[in-house]
Amino acid sequence: GKDSMYVDGNLQGRYGETHKVSALETLQFSTISLIDDVTRCVTMDSKVAGDLVYVLGTTRNELGASEYYAHLGYLGRNVPEVRPDEFAPSYRHLMHAIENGLVASAHGIYRGGLAVHLAMVAMGGNLGLEADLTQVPGGGKMRDDVLLFSESAGRFIVTIDPDKREAFEDIF
């Protein structure tokens, strides 16, 4: 891809005329990092039937400007907030768990929310999965649709071998 603050294109009109279309200016970031051992990298797809599924990070009522609200024709006002001080420890713990071979798969939760990304993890591994929404962090008294489609930042779906449960949970 390209990193650019400007995205322009030309669309042909109904009568052959050309219309210049420009996206809003958008700041984009690219990052790189050294990986000490590429064999420790994990992918997003579920690996083995029976693996445990964890949701890391807090789900909040942040449906504003979400895919779900767009589908319903709403805009909403509770847009996802970025909370770096809250996310950093969770990211470090996840990195530690991956480095120690405890994580079978990991996938970020973003556009579309938990429901969309649980489906992606399951389909990626050609497996089904079972999720208990009462165990989703932050879910307390939230409606199921909020839990499933909130686009709260800083969250991950992680699958692990049941034999590694104790070691994984000790990290978190």
Language model regions located:
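Mobile "lid/hinge" segments at catalytic clefts and subdomain interfaces of large enzymes
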Residues: 15, 21-86, 95-98, 152-153, ...
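Residue-level detector of flexible, active-site-proximal loop/helix-junction positions
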Residues: 5-6, 36, 60, 138
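Gly/Pro-rich turn-and-neighbor structural signature
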Residues: 1-3
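Hydrophobic alpha-helical segments and helix-packing faces
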Residues: 83, 87, 111-114
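Glycine-/charge-enriched secondary-structure boundary and capping motifs
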Residues: 6-8, 12-28, 75-76, 97-172
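Phosphate-sensing "switch" segment of ASCE/P-loop ATPases
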Residues: 91
